[in-house]
Amino acid sequence: MIEDLHVHSTMSDGSDTFEQVLEQAAQRGVERLAFTNHDTTAGLTAARELGERLGVQVVGGIEVSAYDFERGRKVHILGLGVEEGAPALAALCGSTLERRHANSLWQLDRLVEAGYEVDVERALELGRASTCLYKQHLMAALTSEPYPSAAYRTLYRSLFKNGGICDRDIDYVDARDAVRVVVEDGGLAVLAHPGQLDSYDLLPDLVECGLGGIERFHPDHTLADHARCAELAVRYRLVCTGGSDYHGKFGRVPHVGFRVPA
């Protein structure tokens, strides 16, 4: 079976619309796909209807941007099987979207003040098509270099990392609350790419809050991560999931879908 349970669209920080993603999925023989846009379930109903017409089963999803305050690390929680407008998630994530949008506007102002040739209207247009303005929108308005290129990565790191003029983050929700809320809204709470964010240590606490899955297969995971996730899944009786973390032109993964191991 070919599936993908971690995909982003223009509703958050992806470059492709729901329709573009699903058309690609259908062409590649993807049977099941979850849209897991950051901190929003917007558009899932229409996406599911489009998926039915194209022969792709669309699973409602979300990726909650969260934090482990005890260890000082970012944590991402996938919610699979949730519906558009899921009330508890909307209440939890709404403030995150507001903070991210305000921070991105601040970053845009810093770029303009510093004299960078940034297409402000293009950035704002991309933000309007999404649920808020993202760094990826600012980069798209700043350079035509493709995401995987060394020039893109160098520019991004110089501006948004390591003390650059746009290096400012926002406050996130507690990862434990994220798990509880996904469960409250009827979804399967999954620890996303723990190898990428080194969030393994938090897993026992999240299980106590209702965590039901762990993302084993992810482009940033090594074989050691695969093995560790499999072992933890058995120990804590978790479902193993996998996905591409596809962002279109705003990411390094070229396409959606992967073959689920037997």
UniProtKB/Swiss-Prot annotation:
One MF annotation (Gene Ontology) recorded for this entry: phosphoribosyl 1,2-cyclic phosphate 1,2-diphosphodiesterase activity
Family matches, as InterPro entries: Cycl_ph_dihydrol, PHP_dom, PHP_domain, Pol/His_phosphatase_N, Pol/histidinol_Pase-like
SUPFAM superfamilies on file: PHP domain-like (SSF89550)
Record flagged with keyword Transferase: no
Cofactor: Mn(2+)
Catalytically driven reaction(s): alpha-D-ribose 1,2-cyclic phosphate 5-phosphate + H2O = D-ribose 2,5-bisphosphate + H(+); D-ribose 2,5-bisphosphate + H2O = D-ribose 5-phosphate + phosphate
SMART domains found in the cross-reference section: POLIIIAc
Residues involved in Mn(2+) 2 binding: 13, 38, 247
Swiss-Prot/TrEMBL keywords: Hydrolase, Manganese, Metal-binding
EC number: 3.1.4.57
Annotated TM spans: none
Keyword Hydrolase: yes
Amino-acid positions noted as binding Mn(2+) 1 in the UniProt annotation, renumbered to this chain: 6, 8, 63, 245
Binding site for Mn(2+) 3: 63, 76, 193
Family: Belongs to the PHP family.
Task performed by this protein: Involved in degradation of methylphosphonate. Catalyzes the hydrolysis of the phosphate ester at carbon-1 of 5-phospho-D-ribose 1,2-cyclic phosphate to form ribose 2,5-bisphosphate. This intermediate is then hydrolyzed to ribose-5-phosphate and inorganic phosphate.
Protein name per the record: Phosphoribosyl 1,2-cyclic phosphate 1,2-diphosphodiesterase
Classification lineage: Bacteria, Bacillati, Actinomycetota, Coriobacteriia, Eggerthellales
